[in-house]
């Protein structure tokens, strides 16, 4: 069995799917850990090619020998809610001004998508987490 590589850094980024490039914020974040930036960009773009138009969070683990691995996460709940509600951004005063409405079916659908990344035991608990996010953005859940 090969010896374990020593982890020297963990980088979390949110990048548009299929659009990673060496410009900020990607380049500086990876450069300070000595990672080959173009190699990461090519791998990330290939992995997210089918999800274009969405923001995909990525967790990059950097090892002592400057190699890396990365794990893709599901898109942020806020972005999925904005897309479902059909609005550009949430309310500046969420408890006073409501900007949109989403149905419980839409919330459950988003919860299904996010289930892997949420700390919930079942879909109903995940849906409540998503509904809380919606409420804090000024989106009404019906």
From Swiss-Prot:
Organism for this UniProt entry: Mycolicibacterium paratuberculosis (strain ATCC BAA-968 / K-10)
Function of the molecule: Forms part of the ribosomal stalk which helps the ribosome interact with GTP-bound translation factors.
Domain of life the protein comes from: Bacteria
Keywords on record: Methylation, Ribonucleoprotein, Ribosomal protein, RNA-binding, rRNA-binding
Lineage, highest ranks first: Bacteria, Bacillati, Actinomycetota, Actinomycetes, Mycobacteriales
Pfam families according to UniProt: Ribosomal_L11, Ribosomal_L11_N
Residues in the signal sequence: none
InterPro entries (alphabetical): Ribosomal_uL11, Ribosomal_uL11_bac-typ, Ribosomal_uL11_C, Ribosomal_uL11_C_sf, Ribosomal_uL11_CS, Ribosomal_uL11_N, Ribosomal_uL11_N_sf
Listed name of the protein: Large ribosomal subunit protein uL11
